[in-house]
Amino acid sequence: MLALRRHFRLVLMLAVVLAAATPAAVRAQGKLEARYSATLAGIQIGKGSWVIDITDTQYMAAANGVTTGLMRVFTGGEGTSAAHGTLQAGQPMSSIFASTIAASHKTDDVSLTVANGIVTESRLDPPLETEPDRVPISDENRKGILDPMTASLMRTPGSGNPLSPEACQRTVAIFDGRLRYDLQFAFKRMDKVKADKGYAGPVVVCAVYFSPIAGYISSRAAIRYVSKLRDIEVWLAPIAGTRVLVPFRMQGPTPIGKFVLEANQFVSVPIPTRASANGLKTQ
């Protein structure tokens, strides 16, 4: 059971890495309703849902998930996360982030307030424990960051097809309240997907490389393991009406098999801009 719990913590860390990406900037607005299934070595271990709303002035993203099957028997877990922010010059700027994860009879709560990329307030329950080999989080580490939920939206630069290699060319600074880390993305290939409900079409596949910066315990095996991985992938699909791409599928190796998080529902619809809506009303 202890071994399963250790592997579960590793899977949770891998899921955090896979779920993070970069900020989005939109020319139009859209909404996404998605449902995901998580498997480990081909066995379902979890499921979740994700809702994203992007308007002309702000965005909202919320997700929840639970463990299922054998994983729930040994280490039941569930979690929720949400973020809200404004669009400044088309760029999402984090305002509020909150996350709650409950697993193995323990609950972890995090809330962040962010202004202009700088963390102005953070609340952790339980507080971050003092460990001799924990890399301290400095004030500088709290600047120029994205919260993990805001970081899950990727905007392709330019005016061409957003499903292009350029979507992957970036490095992102992320702070989740306890850990400051970088994710580096690199283009791997184009592929195709088909959800049971919703999107069917091309995706951009990016390689993802995790680099811990601060807040981590250097002796932790999970940190060392994920830092060395070179086989993590994220498959990006579009939110209709925007240049924003978000993860459709995420995968990476673990010591006991491949971890995969994949959408079985990916329903995305464009929302008319205010100018478009006003034009329709006058016709």
Sequence positions of predicted segments:
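Internal, conserved structured core segments that host functional sites
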Residues: 105-149
